[in-house]
């Protein structure tokens, strides 16, 4: 499997890859007060998001800890297409309904699960636009008309479509949403169109590596129910000027603002071929008597074919201030030195996904 993952990763980085993202949760938030509702639910600001634009949405519980995330597209002034994590779809909808019915019954909003109504085909890589352009019906998908984090409605081979210009790989990317009944036909059409461009199907393991190279978190892997947006490196997403949102008061607590909290960092081993074990603990002094003081742990660890070496993400106490330091992973038969670095290993400026 390792050889397949490396092959698929390089294909996405160099040509194009196709991935079935249909399992992602989808919720339609509709009504005159849809933007107000989103503004109260998510940590982000939504009222000024333009129609046809997308935003990375981060949802917290009342305690201020990250509960779910996903890209949200504004389809119309009164309609949002919300994506959730695969496992979080039912919980997010339940949470939304709970707040709508008990806290804000005055809001004129309807919520509908559309997870099973849409098939989602992710087309990622530098050749993605060349493959997709001949298939969409009279739609300009150039970077000038459809920039990164945009959404447009149209048709693909006569089939109704919501096309998102988004990327979880760090490359130029599109997510083609079509009715589930047409999903296989459109997949096969995209697949055939991509043969001349080296299109390669890729799976979940490859997706995990690609997103880790970009430092993108996965809820439930980088988060464990005790992680705030800032801990996860997503403090930029929090709407600082918003009067209120779920979790706002908790995020203001001193305990949740401590500089010693576990924070997301990148991890590099001295030996580029050594892949850390996920869950491995990191300490400052491997010679300290047991029980050693744990400073953090590895959340994600992979070999990056793109970079030609191993990479890892971890949550470390005061991690951002420790960048450049060396910590240690005590193993049964050896001690592994690990350098703390920025969690974005690939294209930190975002040039490729904005192509």
Question: Where in the sequence are the language-model features?
Answer:
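Acidic, proline/glycine-enriched N-terminal capping motif
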Residues: 1-57, 65
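Membrane-targeting and insertion segments and their boundary/processing signals
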Residues: 8-12, 63-66, 70, 102, ...
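Acidic active-site catalytic centers that drive phospho-/nucleotidyl reactions
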Residues: 20, 69, 175
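Residue-level detector of beta-strand structural context in well-folded domains
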Residues: 25, 57, 70-71, 152, ...
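Well-ordered mid-protein domain cores that form the structural environment of catalytic cofactors
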Residues: 45-78, 83-99
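Conserved, structured C-terminal
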Residues: 76-355
């Amino acid at each position: 499997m390792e050889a397949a993952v490396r092959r698929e990763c390089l294909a996405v980085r160099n040509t194009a890859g196709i991935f079935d993202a249909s399992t992602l949760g989808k919720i339609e938030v509709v009504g005159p007060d849809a933007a107000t509702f989103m503004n109260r639910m998510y940590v982000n600001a939504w009222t000024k998001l333009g129609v046809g634009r997308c935003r990375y949405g981060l949802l917290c519980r009342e305690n201020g800890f990250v509960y779910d995330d996903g890209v949200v597209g504004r389809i119309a002034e009164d309609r949002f297409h919300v994506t959730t994590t695969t496992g979080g779809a039912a919980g997010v909808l339940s949470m939304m309904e709970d707040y709508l019915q008990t806290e804000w019954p005055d809001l004129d909003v309807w919520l509908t699960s559309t997870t099973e109504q849409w098939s989602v085909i992710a087309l990622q890589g530098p050749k993605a636009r060349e493959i997709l352009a001949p298939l969409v019906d009279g739609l300009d998908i150039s970077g000038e008309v459809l920039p990164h984090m945009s959404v447009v409605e149209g048709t693909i081979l006569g089939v109704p479509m919501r096309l998102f210009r988004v990327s979880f790989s760090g490359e130029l990317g599109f997510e083609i949403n079509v009715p589930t009944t047409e999903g296989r036909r459109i997949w096969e059409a995209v697949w055939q169109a991509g043969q001349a461009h080296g299109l390669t199907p890729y799976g979940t393991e490859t997706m995990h590596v690609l997103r880790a190279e970009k430092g993108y978190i996965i809820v439930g892997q980088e988060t464990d129910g005790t992680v705030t947006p800032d801990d996860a490196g997503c403090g930029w997403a929090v709407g600082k000027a918003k009067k209120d949102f779920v979790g706002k008061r908790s995020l203001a607590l001193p305990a949740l603002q401590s500089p010693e909290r576990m924070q997301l960092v990148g991890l590099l081993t001295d030996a580029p071929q050594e892949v850390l074990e996920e869950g491995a603990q990191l300490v400052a002094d491997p010679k300290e008597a047991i029980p050693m003081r744990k400073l953090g742990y590895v959340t994600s660890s992979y070999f990056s074919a793109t970079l030609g070496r191993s990479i890892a993400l971890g949550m470390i106490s005061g991690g951002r201030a420790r960048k450049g330091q060396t910590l240690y992973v005590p193993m049964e038969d050896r001690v592994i030195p690990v350098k703390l670095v920025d969690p974005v290993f690939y294209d930190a400026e975002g040039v490729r996904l904005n192509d």
